[in-house]
Amino acid sequence: MTQITPQEALQRTIEHREIFHDEMLHLMRLIMRGELSPVMTAAIVTGLRVKKETIGEITAAAEVMREFSNKVHVEDKRHLVDIVGTGGDGANTFNISTCSIFVIAAAGGKVSKHGGRSVSSKSGSADAMEALGVNIQLTPEQIARSIADVGIGFMFAPNHHPAMKNVAPVRKELGVRTIFNILGPLTNPASAPNILMGVFHEDLVGIQVRALQRLGAEHAIVVYGRDGLDEISLGAGTLVGELKDGVVREYEIHPEDFGLRMVGTRAFKVDNPEESKAMLLGVLHGEKSAARDIVCLNAGAALYAANVASSIEDGMARAQAALDSGAALAKLNELVAYTARLTA
């Protein structure tokens, strides 16, 4: 194991030089164990941000975060998928990916959803799940059972990454994006081999998909809407980085490719968790709307990532059927009842 002092690491970032894989492993372990001072931690993560984190640095940091996490052991991972965003897009949309998980599970996928409370949005995935009546305070064993029995397991990030408490005050005080914003989506506690990930900057599409490749992902789709959305957008083209069969492809897709009309993000904007819940439930109750279209498109891509569907188009058709039949709404009700029983 190559040792590097925190001061040497900081000097590297100032000189815009890379911190190599083994060095980053050592440095990240110091941070995760709380062995660096808040000042040094802040300096290093800020330096990395200014320099721009490399694929190697991100991969090594994610490996350490996974190492320190409380894991969820899932037996059958064939169709296991996470649908997650880095957040920070500033769009304040309703919980598109959270709504999508019920559609995905109803259409034959299994979802290990990794999320937390709101940081930059009006409603984080954990806030949304609680508002819907889902108990998010489950043990790793209970989450694994929920995935097996219902097809959905929600993993509340603070319960799975206790070492992050060592950097939480630094992140809060800095108030800017750091490497930790892009590590969360790379550190699914159930090690989902398939993922649909939204990112907040176009440069991250190629970076994150290649980090996922190095971390052993099987089918990964990383997306960035050109209107700034960290989802597949209806308001603009969406940049895509796809890892499949060990090969990365980058391309662009548009709403009209899927027979959908372009709609600006204002159509999905909410001001509080109650509005987000109302829009989400409207979709699950089968209302025809732009909100339904963006959920079907993103759930369809996740079903393709999960190898349930043969393409995004096929996934979208399956998503529409799950909503029209009422199966997606039934899946929400099933999860609410199941998680209530587990802790009764």
Swiss-Prot record:
Give the binding site residues for Mg(2+) 1. 97, 231
Protein origin, superkingdom? Bacteria
At the top of the EC hierarchy, this enzyme's class is: transferase
Task: State how the cofactor is bound.
Answer: Binds 2 magnesium ions per monomer.
Binding sites annotated in the UniProt record for 5-phospho-alpha-D-ribose 1-diphosphate: 85, 88-89, 93, 95-98, 113-121, 125
Q: Which UniProt keywords apply?
A: Amino-acid biosynthesis, Aromatic amino acid biosynthesis, Glycosyltransferase, Magnesium, Metal-binding, Transferase, Tryptophan biosynthesis
Residues where anthranilate 2 binds = 171
Entry binding sites for Mg(2+) 2: 230-231
- Tell me its EC number(s), please: 2.4.2.18
Name its GO BP terms in alphabetical order.
Answer: L-tryptophan biosynthetic process
What pathway annotation does it carry?
Answer: Amino-acid biosynthesis; L-tryptophan biosynthesis; L-tryptophan from chorismate: step 2/5
Under InterPro entries, the record lists:
Anthranilate_Pribosyl_Tfrase, Glycosyl_Trfase_fam3, Glycosyl_Trfase_fam3_N_dom, Glycosyl_Trfase_fam3_N_dom_sf, Nuc_phospho_transferase
Please tell me whether the keyword Magnesium is annotated for this protein.
yes
**One GO cellular component from the entry?**
cytosol
GO molecular function: any one? magnesium ion binding
Q: What is this protein's function per UniProt?
A: Catalyzes the transfer of the phosphoribosyl group of 5-phosphorylribose-1-pyrophosphate (PRPP) to anthranilate to yield N-(5'-phosphoribosyl)-anthranilate (PRA).
Q: How does it assemble?
A: Homodimer.
What's the protein here called? Anthranilate phosphoribosyltransferase
- The species this protein belongs to is Delftia acidovorans (strain DSM 14801 / SPH-1)
Q: Name the encoding gene, please.
A: trpD
